[in-house]
Amino acid sequence: TALKLSEKLDRYGIKIIGTTYKSLDLAEDRGSFSTLLKENKIPYPEFGVAETPDEALVIADKLDFPILIRPSYVLGGQGMKIVINKKELEDHVKDLLEKIPNNKLLLDHYLDGAIEAEADAICDGKNVLIIGIMEHIEPCGVHSGDSNATLPPFNLGKLVMQQIIDHTNKIALSLNTVGLINIQFAIKDEVVYII
């Protein structure tokens, strides 16, 4: 992945053109990224990070079902699943930890009935240009690479569109983005969450 490659280059002191490894890693690290979102007053679903089935069960008690589970630091929606009870959660967590050992698992409260959207933007570190905002056709939770979307969005009101624009600008600038950025959103009850 780009993150792994940039980490190696950073370790050897090789500068890259574009967003720094530190910013890429911050965007991928759920704990650090949620701090950035809090500082910018940007909503996101409640979440937890687990390394064992027991930890996942403790987190599930705090989040309430349904819960979206996925491995940390993987691409393509690998291992992502929405679970609706403790038995499903425990089975999926055990399966993931066998398939991808030594990986942390992300557990998000799943915003049932939410609409998914995403924004693509380009930033020079000071200015953000939103290239496009897409609205997904499938329910929120289907991996974006496996779903269809419309450009421009067909059913997002002015309030929602403004939140997407504001969130995209704040995140791109807070991460010191230099280059492209893609941000995914879940919209429920006119509130735009980062997912």
Feature annotation, model-predicted:
Residues 1-183, 187-195:
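N-terminal beta-alpha lobe that positions the nucleotide/phosphoryl donor
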